[in-house]
Amino acid sequence: MNSTPPTSPVTRVSDGSFPSISNNSKGFAYRQPQKHKSNFAYSHLVSPVEEPTAKFSEAFQTDYSSKAPVATSEAHLKNDLDVLFTTPRFYSPENLALMFRLSNTVSSLEFLDEFLMGILLAPEMDFLSNPSYSLPSNKLVGQGSYSYVYPISSSASSRCNNDSGVVLKFAKSQHKSKVILQEALTLAYLQYMSPSTNESHIIPFYGLTYITKSHFRRLRSNECVPGLILPKCEMSLYHFNTAVSHKLSLITKRKIWWRLMKQMIDALKSLKTNGIIHGDIKTANILITEMHVLNGGHCKDFDFYLADFTSAFHINQTPTDLNTTVEYCAPELIDSSSDHVPTFESDLYAVGLCLLSFISQHEPYNELQALVSHGSSPGIGSSSIQQSQWLINALLKKDPINLNMLRNDLFQDWKSELALLSRILVDRLPLENLITILDSNYI
């Protein structure tokens, strides 16, 4: 487990679908992978998102049609997948074949490598074969335990400062490449099953490329690491809560809260339809599109997207370890009598805590922990072990609303919202029942 603050790529989301370019792009076309017909047990499920494929940035309207494809990144990816599958953490070849519904095709495992290459790689944005792409060394967007996030600069871009409108989330070192590849497999799968991620509010995935020390000098001379091409967003919900929310009127904040609720429920619905558990939902992993705060405490509409799938896994394969954030854990994930494996229910619980943080403008239990610590209560000490034990004890009380709403005025101002959160965090209402309530009473 971890208790780290924001690690997601804070970048602008474009209405995108993997891996597709607008028909208006000049001489630039991605191949949209075709779904394989199958009698797989879940083939009747229908994605909540059915939209035309989306647009890429105008920066990538470069004509490569006359050039033969360069397989540089492809060779590295094939080798890395072979290594990944020898000791799979989340995805085995057999599991992936089932997920992508290849199990009833002839020699599905033999076809799997070729299939994965087709849905993962972004050949028109291959850093190893196209020198027009670079990573500005002075523009770090974010970083986590496994990765850095930098904007992609393109000399072919018509934008100012060669801004391409996308970012690269890449492994910090070669031995951390597995985590990035697992996230790429999850995002590619979600986008393959639901060709547009706009209405499902899951971060779009534009493909994978490899970089070396020539692109990022902190890498070792012999390292070649994978990176995810993702769209830009304005900020994370964590940043919104700490730096923007206080500037807005209560009416505006309540409107945004309901928008956040609906869009995260849409994301959870899409994940459950496709059998994916996120495993680390928190305010730092919910990204916000371009937002403009207006005079009078108002702001223009914007959207939320669920991001950072480094802990995600498919229900057909149980993860070998738990890598999540303690503050956002459902009680059963830390209870000694449970299996400690994230579920659809624990994902919904984490979304509930994100919505609670939106109201309190504090991370879960952070305000109470600071208050107790400063009051020299015997229940909490200064050591990290004592603080962690205090946090675990607070989680096991199963009273998140009262332990996080420390101002009386919040109960009055957010009465209906807190009543709904009580159904999520205390009654532990299933997602389907929550959707029914929202459809009939709130939306």
From Swiss-Prot:
Keywords: ATP-binding, Kinase, Nucleotide-binding, Serine/threonine-protein kinase, Transferase
Enzyme class: transferase
UniProt-listed PROSITE patterns: PROTEIN_KINASE_ATP (PS00107), PROTEIN_KINASE_DOM (PS50011), PROTEIN_KINASE_ST (PS00108)
One annotated GO biological process: negative regulation of UDP-N-acetylglucosamine biosynthetic process
This enzyme's EC code(s): 2.7.11.1
Record-annotated active site: 280
Binding site for ATP: 141-149, 169
Catalytic reactions on record: L-seryl-[protein] + ATP = O-phospho-L-seryl-[protein] + ADP + H(+); L-threonyl-[protein] + ATP = O-phospho-L-threonyl-[protein] + ADP + H(+)
Record domain Protein kinase: where: 135-415
A GO molecular-function annotation: protein serine kinase activity
Function: Probable serine/threonine protein kinase which may function redundantly with MPK1-independent branch of the PCK1 pathway that is presumed to be required for the tolerance to high temperatures and staurosporine.
Note: Present with 1590 molecules/cell in log phase SD medium.
Family according to the record: Belongs to the protein kinase superfamily. Ser/Thr protein kinase family.
Entry-linked PANTHER family: MITOGEN-ACTIVATED KINASE KINASE KINASE (PTHR24361)
Name of the featured protein: Serine/threonine-protein kinase ISR1
Protein species of origin: Saccharomyces cerevisiae (strain ATCC 204508 / S288c)
Source taxonomy: Eukaryota, Fungi, Dikarya, Ascomycota, Saccharomycotina
